[in-house]
């Protein structure tokens, strides 16, 4: 396995199939003597199902996923310093409901404030500089208000995440294999492929995660793979023809499954048989 071209690629959580039960997966992994962990993530996130629930536990789980995508992993890139400070303030307020929001730069520094900053922004300023910005952000979003409601703060962060074009996406790290046609040759070798309600997103795996292309599921004509490769036949509207994208990945089966799951979910939600 170590000699495989995909061996060094980061692996992302594998979405469970609809028919999988956690207990069965737990038993299977235990028998295989493999290290594993479960990661909570809503598998299918459609716009028409994005509203808050009356169940506070459900909202809490959705919040944790949004916080992870925005702050812990940075999968949803935040593009402005102002928004970074506001999101960090919300995250801190939710994490410290009993202690209350820190009221000074020193108090914020003492809670290791960089841990509340998205990875691509974390090292651009000192902890003291971020703390000063977060104090301002907290005032703008009400995170430091004495009567701040925890549920409202969570919903504010969820709202920010849900407006992102990549919200709800499942991400897979891949190497590009083929060099033709031109649209493929222009892509870097290392890619991050995401699938959400809007379709397939192709990003540069380098720092900054530059967006390269997005294709709706109607543009993905065929897909499939083996244990080490995944290929897609995609319609390119600009040249009015299809092209093949061949990728090296250890998660071909996971990618194939989430495409099908999203297509089925979209068809069911729109009443298409």
Where are these regions (language model features)?
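Small/flexible residues
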Residues: 13-16, 44, 124
């Amino acid at each position: 396995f170590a000699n495989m071209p995909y061996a060094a690629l980061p692996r992302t959580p594998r979405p469970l199939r609809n028919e999988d039960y956690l207990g069965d997966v737990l038993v299977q992994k235990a028998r295989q003597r493999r290290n594993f962990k479960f990661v909570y993530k809503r598998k299918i996130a459609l716009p028409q199902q994005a509203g808050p629930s009356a169940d506070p536990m459900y909202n809490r789980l959705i919040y944790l996923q949004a916080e992870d995508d925005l702050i812990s992993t940075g999968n949803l890139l935040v593009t402005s310093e102002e928004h970074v400070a506001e999101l960090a303030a919300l995250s801190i307020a939710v994490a410290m409901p009993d202690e209350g929001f820190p009221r000074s730069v020193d108090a914020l520094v003492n809670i290791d404030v960089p841990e509340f900053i998205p990875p691509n922004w974390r090292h651009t300023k000192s902890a003291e500089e971020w703390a000063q910005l977060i104090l301002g952000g907290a005032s703008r979003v009400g995170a430091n208000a004495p009567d701040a409601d925890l549920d409202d703060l969570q919903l504010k962060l969820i709202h920010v995440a849900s407006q992102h074009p990549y919200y709800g996406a499942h991400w897979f790290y891949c190497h590009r294999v083929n060099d033709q046609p031109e649209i493929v040759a222009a892509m870097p070798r290392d890619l991050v492929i995401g699938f959400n309600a809007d379709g397939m997103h192709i990003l540069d795996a380098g720092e900054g995660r530059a967006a390269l292309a997005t294709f709706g599921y109607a543009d993905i004509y065929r897909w499939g793979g083996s244990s080490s490769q995944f290929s897609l036949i995609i319609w390119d509207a600009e040249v009015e023809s299809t092209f093949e994208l061949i990728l090296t990945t250890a998660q071909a089966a996971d990618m194939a499954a989430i495409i099908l799951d999203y297509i089925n979910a979209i068809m069911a939600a729109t009443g298409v048989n």
